[in-house]
């Protein structure tokens, strides 16, 4: 059965030229015109990559700090003890703990957006891997969230670090800002994000790397992006 869209959504759809492939500049301008919600909508980038994530050598995963942030207030939890716990608090972590934090999470109290851990804490954090993993909250060295430099990791998270991971079908979704951002800020965030994706292209990936790309707002239809323009972005 075909999905029925609201009248508002249909009106937004009429603003998008059917079948058109948009340049980055055009797409950013267009999505800002599609703002219709009462809240400050997130600008969302969706990519489909030519990779098979079932093979370990084709997994695309990492993180990037967006130059203009995400526009989102991020709550950061840090698993650390002693001097590293003190360092995390001084650098702005919202929650710092060890066994007590693990217990909170086991009891269903997850009040954070990003989790960071010192390497020595990963044995403990592993106990709640089944809880954090599906939510995309498990600390990982590839995203810079398992580190001794907890201060920098907290600062990156607060500054707008976006962690990403390709799903089983080769898709990556990321919020790259808010509808209230300037066109220039959104463009720079998008290009910074895509440059990192290009940098992480697996050697084993065959054929076209970015197969499909679209930009949208939380409550809007998507506009299709020129994938060649994206693949030409270098970091």
From Swiss-Prot:
Instruction: Establish whether keyword Ribosomal protein is in the entry.
Output: yes
Record's GO cellular component terms? cytosolic large ribosomal subunit
InterPro entries assigned to the protein according to its UniProt record, in alphabetical order: Ribosom_uL1_bac-type, Ribosomal_uL1, Ribosomal_uL1-like, Ribosomal_uL1/biogenesis, Ribosomal_uL1_3-a/b-sand, Ribosomal_uL1_CS
- Which SUPFAM superfamilies does the annotation name? Ribosomal protein L1
| Annotated GO biological process | regulation of translation; translation
User: Which molecular function term from Gene Ontology is one that the record holds?
Assistant: rRNA binding
- The highest taxon in the source lineage is Bacteria
Mind listing the UniProt keywords for this protein, alphabetically? Repressor, Ribonucleoprotein, Ribosomal protein, RNA-binding, rRNA-binding, Translation regulation, tRNA-binding
Give the family, as the similarity comment puts it: Belongs to the universal ribosomal protein uL1 family.
Q: What is its biological role?
A: Binds directly to 23S rRNA. The L1 stalk is quite mobile in the ribosome, and is involved in E site tRNA release.
Q: How does it assemble?
A: Part of the 50S ribosomal subunit.
The protein, known as: Large ribosomal subunit protein uL1
